[in-house]
Amino acid sequence: MRAYCVFCNIVAGNEPANIVYEDDEVIVIQNILRWVPVMLLAMTKAHTTQTELWEEHIEKVGKIAHKVGAELCPGGYRLLSNFGYDAMQSQEHGHLHILGGTFLGHYVG
């Protein structure tokens, strides 16, 4: 756990969050941003970078993100990640965005 990491603090129960899914290794929470009706974040409970998430944990996190997306957005959903400043990655803790609940068009935001 990183004391400065908001996601680590959510996992530890030190910060509030609307938890959509949780197991021993993965958590899915509602994003505080509400650009579309379904806007979730899927991540490992252990602190990982975005690169570590994709290189070491994407199979498990991806399967769960797909399952949650399919359940909540039967008309379709989008999974994405931002890598680095230019892509507007705002949190160091690696995570996948699950977006849906409406027609997303070519881009969101």
Language-model region placement:
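HIT superfamily nucleotide-processing domains
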Residues: 1-109
